[in-house]
């Protein structure tokens, strides 16, 4: 099969991440993304490497027997959701199967390696579950009207105005519509990624699930030719605050970003209304969140994730960490560190993002926790500098997993138990191979679905020292 070949096939399975395996009438297998098991699809081969062909999806010729009617009018055009036409229980089955395959390919099956795979916990909410969205300004086609939403599937430039997005609640949709209407009427140009000209870049919206508090951050360039920015922003603030919301508006902000890269970047933020932060609650703790704070985007799902992790850590003995020191490596804003603090002597969190460390310290103080210590720095370097030795280690690394040298240092501590929380099962499978080759074994595994209708999945693993 050569590059440029156009063919059809039936998708027999989908591997992580979002890689459909389509089988042609001749028995050839082609990887086609954004597909669902059982679909008959047309594809064009765009890559052939080591006798392995990858194709771009051109058309779904026949729907899968698994599929139902899509609840979102943007599905198929928007690049946000992939499994929205699949019933939720089947989505969970697909994700569980994908993770099980990756783990068993890496370290053996449950029977071969002796671990227990508990299954998968679903999200408490299947729709309207997100507490944060980053919308982009642009157009839906070249020289078309202003758009505000998500990138079209497979497109770097074109957008879909997701005014009826189903993974956020009505307040998000109201804010999007109010913003788009206002700037469209004022003929304000968006920042063009090719010419690097224009004003409007992104709209960042956050809403706490538990408290209902909302903040909005408009991200623009400093290119203000042709209009009075102060008057424009005052009008924007008015356009937002005069709409009806179920939640409580806590702040409207304006962030400047002249970076060429198409990412939300903070080069200076001003408050147009209210505060620059809001509060969310998680498992009885309170967290102060700014527009750029890292915080799990599904608050109710995060409670399931962290409660499951806490059960893995403590087991049947709720006093097992009394008088002990816990390392929380890649600790982010210190959520899990603060959840463990009441049951241990001390928690030491290590995180490379300095702003996240500042937030962790502030939130620990907010929750009255004086036995949390947070250190800003690379885990690989900080482990050489910490004097306290851990009795237990919690690992919650970024998507790429743990640096091999850092794994070596972690193993040298020789702790009896560790819990690994992973947001990318391919990285997890690779890292588990290293742990198992260095005197540890996998005791049990559980998946948690934090992102319904997408291919993303979280996995929690209890790792134990052999003969412990």
Regions found by a protein language model. Give the residues of each.
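Extended interfacial segments that mediate partner engagement and assembly in macromolecular machines
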Residues: 59-70, 79-190, 210
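Rossmann-like S-adenosyl-L-methionine
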Residues: 1-7, 13-17, 222-468
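Internal alpha/beta scaffold segment
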Residues: 157-201, 222-254
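Structural signature of eukaryotic scaffold interfaces centered on beta-propeller domains
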Residues: 206-208
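Short, acidic/hydrophobic/Gly-rich beta-strand patch recurrent on exposed beta strands
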Residues: 20-25, 149-152, 217-219, 360
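Terminal RNA-binding accessory module
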Residues: 1-74, 111, 153, 373, ...
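Short, conserved phosphate/pyrophosphate- and ester-handling motifs at nucleotide-, phospho-/glycolipid
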Residues: 38, 168, 298
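Short, solvent-exposed loop/turn elements at beta->coil junctions and helix N-caps
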Residues: 118-126, 193, 200-202, 447-450
């Amino acid at each position: 099969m050569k590059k440029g070949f156009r063919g059809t096939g039936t998708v027999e399975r989908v591997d992580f991440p979002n890689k459909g395996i389509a089988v042609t009438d001749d028995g050839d297998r082609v990887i086609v993304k954004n597909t669902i098991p059982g679909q008959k699809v047309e594809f064009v081969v765009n890559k052939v490497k080591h006798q392995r062909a990858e194709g771009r999806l051109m058309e779904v010729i026949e729907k899968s027997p698994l599929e139902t009617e899509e609840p979102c009018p943007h599905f198929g055009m928007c690049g946000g959701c992939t499994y929205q036409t699949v019933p939720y229980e089947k989505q969970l089955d697909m994700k569980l199967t994908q993770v099980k395959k990756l783990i068993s390919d890496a370290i053996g099956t449950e029977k071969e390696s002796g671990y227990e795979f508990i299954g998968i916990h679903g999200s408490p909410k299947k729709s309207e579950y997100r507490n944060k969205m980053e919308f982009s300004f642009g157009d839906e086609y070249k020289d078309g009207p202003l758009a505000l939403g998500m990138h079209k599937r497979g497109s770097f430039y074109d957008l879909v105005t997701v005014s009826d997005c189903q993974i956020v609640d009505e307040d998000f949709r109201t804010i999007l519509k109010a913003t788009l209407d206002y700037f469209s009427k004022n003929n304000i140009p968006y920042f063009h990624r090719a010419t690097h000209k224009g004003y409007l870049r992104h709209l960042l919206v956050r809403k706490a699930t538990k408290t209902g508090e909302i903040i909005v951050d408009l991200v623009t360039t400093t290119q203000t030719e042709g209009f009075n920015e102060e008057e424009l922003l005052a009008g924007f603030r008015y356009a937002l605050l005069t709409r009806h919301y179920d939640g409580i508006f806590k702040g409207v902000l304006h962030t400047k970003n002249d970076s060429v890269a198409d990412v939300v970047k903070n080069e200076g933020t001003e408050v147009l209304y209210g505060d620059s932060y809001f509060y969310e609650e998680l498992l009885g703790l309170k967290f102060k969140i700014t527009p750029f704070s890292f915080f799990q985007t599904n608050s109710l799902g995060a409670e399931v994730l962290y409660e499951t992790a806490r059960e893995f850590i403590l087991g049947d003995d709720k006093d097992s960490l009394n008088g002990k020191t816990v390392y929380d490596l890649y600790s982010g804003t210190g959520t899990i560190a603060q959840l463990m603090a009441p049951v241990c002597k001390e928690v030491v969190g290590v995180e490379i993002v300095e702003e996240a460390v500042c937030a962790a310290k502030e939130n620990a103080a907010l929750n009255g926790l004086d036995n949390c210590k947070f250190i800003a720095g690379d885990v690989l370097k900080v482990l050489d500098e910490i004097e306290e030795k851990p009795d237990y280690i919690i690992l919650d690394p970024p998507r790429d997993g743990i640096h091999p040298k850092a794994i070596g240092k972690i193993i040298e501590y020789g702790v009896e138990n560790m819990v690994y929380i992973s947001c990318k099962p391919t990285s997890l499978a690779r890292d588990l191979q290293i742990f198992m080759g260095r005197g540890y074994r996998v005791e049990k595994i559980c998946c948690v679905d934090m992102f319904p209708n997408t291919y993303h999945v979280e996995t929690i693993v209890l790792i134990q020292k052999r003969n412990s």
